[in-house]
């Protein structure tokens, strides 16, 4: 009976706060006309998918029809699913995805025990990370009475264990057995267990599976830490954890023993005390029975606190030790591998050039395309910038940050290998009159939100506090779906746990994006990145470079001051890029301009931090402060007269290049 009473409050909390983590149908990419050839092919292959999956040991990958109306499809169930359950899940998912995505060429869904995906392009064997969806319970873990520090430790251990088990697993030959699946459990308390399930599509590599799962866990942690459960779904992988078993995935899992209890009390003496002392002894016994457990608990908490602090201290030391990147063997490529990928650094593969070297497009023997940043042997700052970027970016995992795949350090060769981002950089579209039309308001608004989430990760949600110091349009890459990825961490700096700002005499960055306190005094902080973000938002909305306003008149105007004048005159929407037309929400655009003006306030204390910015962008009910006049920037010449060593960063690219932002050039003014 005690067991039932102890479990009941937690169970009731789930009934009250559960926000379903059942995966939604994700529709994306292009459109097709109803009853077109593609639509008929899609319906046909979806109608037979359930029987094909059950007859192919739980995984079916096929195509149907002729190009350009060919449909590619995946269907799979979790290992151990009964054939009838698998069939029902696939059929239900196929029907739901067909209804929810009536005219989209690409879609996928991950219900509890199966997955369905279709597309008009082949995706077999390819790691596909986006679009993704994060779901979570609305209840907080602290509502269950669980200590959050203890929970975090157990949760992280469970996630790492499940990632390892899933990415290294292979088919065991059992019914519907598949590789890249794991279901693990961990005891949170005597009466409470955590359940984690992860799965990748079996057509990707083990390394890609591990990356997909780690990224998903990182995304959940950034979004929903402290919640009572949740899931992250991607086209190539699925992560879910909860405080109760689900999907029938844990029937054969061995449950771990409960966490150790308090130390036992000392044995009671069997020799009876004298009769005259029995009353006193009884009182003493009661006191001992109460005090000893309290002391044990307090000592345990103190030990736990000390261990946690030592652990944090150790992690900080370990991070600084990684400055010697030759120890990072898991990320290292051989020079021969890079040469082969780029056809010996052929000019035809060069996609960018700058003061620190060149950027090449390459293709690894394992399949994926990469962007290879080869630092110049004669660059005086090359080694330091290389170390900085390699150490920083290798630790960053977020969908709005460019992904570092590895590096090469052999002799004088210093090379960084990044994921290949096909749609060039934001400035390529934003400032080209012929390309601006491709950025409608919806895309621009999504780009603003994605950049904000990427900066939030750098400032708060990653294990390091990182100040980018060079946020600008040419350092924002756009993937195939025009999602933004922050790039170029050559100037980034790590802050300590309690550090809020730092100073430098060498001002490095891009004029126009620098905050006044950084440009004039060398002070940089999270608020200086916020200033750069504000300028970037104004550029995205207007389609104009901040620098394009210089020398127009003698007023010293720039985009920031121009936006402020329009705001003050009650006509902020005059800032909106005319190529957008009328297809935007005026309230949404006005709100974004308002947020940008708050970000470029002269006093750093008046600028919002990223959590507040995200809230402002996503909630129309959040009240915004009235902006004051923004900070005014001096020219580079003025800075030199003030005795500040000033270095501006610019980007140069080969005409027709794929990736303008992969290299940054620095030169003295």
Swiss-Prot record:
Membrane-spanning intervals of the chain: 286-306
Cytoplasmic membrane side: 307-669
Protein species of origin: Arabidopsis thaliana (Mouse-ear cress)
Ranges facing Extracellular side: 24-285
EC numbers: 2.7.11.1
Domain of life of the organism encoding this protein: Eukaryota
Location in or out of the cell: Membrane
Entry keyword set: ATP-binding, Glycoprotein, Kinase, Membrane, Nucleotide-binding, Phosphoprotein, Receptor, Repeat, Serine/threonine-protein kinase, Signal, Transferase, Transmembrane, Transmembrane helix
Segments forming domain Protein kinase: 345-624
Domain annotation Gnk2-homologous: ranges: 24-123, 133-246
Residues found modified as Phosphoserine: 474
Molecular function via GO: ATP binding; protein serine kinase activity; protein serine/threonine kinase activity
Residues making up the signal peptide according to the UniProt record: 1-23
Enzyme class: transferase
Family matches, as Pfam families: PK_Tyr_Ser-Thr (PF07714), Stress-antifung (PF01657)
Family indicated by similarity: Belongs to the protein kinase superfamily. Ser/Thr protein kinase family. CRK subfamily.
Name of the protein in question: Cysteine-rich receptor-like protein kinase 34
Binding positions for ATP per the UniProt entry: 351-359, 373
GO CC terms, sorted: plasma membrane
Sugar-bearing residue positions: 35, 52, 103, 120, 147, 172, 252, 280
Membrane topology according to the record: Single-pass membrane protein
């Amino acid at each position: 009976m005690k067991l039932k009473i102890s479990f009941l409050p937690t169970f009731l909390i789930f009934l009250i706060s559960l926000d379903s983590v059942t995966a939604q149908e994700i529709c994306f990419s292009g459109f097709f006309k109803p009853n077109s050839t593609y639509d008929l092919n899609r319906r046909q292959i979806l109608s037979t998918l359930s029987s094909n999956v059950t007859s192919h040991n739980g995984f079916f990958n096929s195509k149907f029809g002729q190009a350009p109306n060919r449909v590619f499809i995946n269907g799979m169930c979790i290992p151990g699913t009964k054939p009838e359950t698998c069939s029902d899940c696939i059929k239900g998912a196929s029907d739901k995805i067909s209804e929810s995505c009536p005219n989209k060429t690409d879609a996928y869904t991950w219900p509890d025990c199966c997955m369905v995906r279709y597309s008009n392009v082949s995706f077999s064997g390819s790691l596909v990370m986006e679009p993704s969806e994060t779901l979570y319970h609305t209840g907080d873990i602290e509502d269950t009475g669980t200590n959050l520090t203890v929970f975090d430790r157990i949760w992280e251990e469970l996630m790492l264990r499940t990632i390892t088990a899933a990415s290294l697993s292979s088919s065991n030959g059992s019914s519907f057995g598949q590789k890249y699946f794991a279901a693990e459990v961990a005891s949170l308390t005597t009466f409470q267990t955590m359940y984690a399930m992860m799965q990748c599509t079996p057509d990707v590599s083990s390394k890609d599976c591990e990356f997909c799962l780690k990224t998903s866990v990182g995304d959940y942690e950034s979004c929903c830490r402290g919640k009572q459960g949740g899931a992250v779904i991607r086209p190539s992988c699925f992560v879910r954890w909860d405080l109760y078993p689900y999907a029938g995935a844990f029937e054969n899992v061995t449950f771990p023993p409960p966490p150790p209890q308090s130390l036992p009390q000392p044995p009671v003496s069997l020799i009876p005390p004298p009769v005259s002392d029995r009353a006193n002894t009884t009182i003493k016994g009661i006191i001992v029975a109460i005090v000893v457990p309290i002391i044990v608990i307090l000592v345990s908490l103190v030990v736990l606190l000390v261990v946690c602090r030592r652990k944090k201290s150790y992690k900080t030391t370990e991070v600084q030790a990684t400055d010697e990147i030759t120890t990072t063997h898991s990320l290292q490529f051989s020079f021969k591998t890079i040469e082969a990928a780029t056809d010996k650094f052929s000019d035809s593969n060069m996609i960018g050039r700058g003061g620190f070297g060149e950027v090449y497009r390459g293709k690894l023997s394992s399949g994926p395309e990469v962007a290879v940043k080869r630092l110049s042997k004669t660059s005086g700052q090359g080694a330091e910038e290389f170390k900085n970027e390699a150490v920083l970016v290798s630790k960053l995992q977020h969908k709005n940050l460019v992904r570092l795949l590895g590096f090469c350090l052999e002799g004088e060769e210093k090379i960084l290998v990044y994921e290949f981002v096909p749609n060039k950089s934001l400035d390529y579209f934003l400032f080209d009159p012929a390309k601006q039309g491709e950025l409608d308001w919806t895309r621009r608004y999504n780009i603003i939100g994605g950049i904000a989430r990427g900066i939030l990760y750098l400032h708060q949600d990653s294990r390091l506090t990182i100040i980018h110091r060079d946020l600008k349009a040419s350092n924002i890459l756009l993937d195939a779906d025009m999602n933004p990825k922050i790039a170029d961490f050559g100037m980034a700096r790590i802050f300590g746990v309690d550090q809020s700002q730092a100073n430098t005499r060498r001002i490095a960055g891009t004029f126009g994006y620098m905050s006044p306190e950084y440009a004039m005094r060398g002070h940089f902080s999270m608020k200086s990145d916020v200033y750069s973000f504000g300028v970037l938002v104004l550029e995205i909305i207007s389609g104009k470079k901040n620098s394009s306003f210089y020398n127009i008149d003698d007023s010293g105007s720039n985009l920031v001051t121009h936006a402020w004048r329009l705001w003050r005159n009650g006509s902020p929407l005059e800032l909106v890029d005319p190529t957008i037309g009328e297809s935007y929400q005026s309230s949404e655009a006005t709100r974004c301009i308002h947020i940008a003006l708050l970000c470029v306030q002269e006093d750093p204390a008046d600028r919002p931090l990223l959590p507040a910015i995200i809230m402002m962008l996503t909630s129309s009910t959040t009240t915004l402060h009235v902006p004051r006049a923004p900070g005014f920037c001096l020219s580079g010449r003025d800075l030199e007269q003030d005795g500040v060593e000033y270095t501006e960063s610019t980007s140069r690219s080969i005409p027709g290049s794929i990736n303008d932002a992969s290299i940054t050039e620095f030169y003295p003014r």
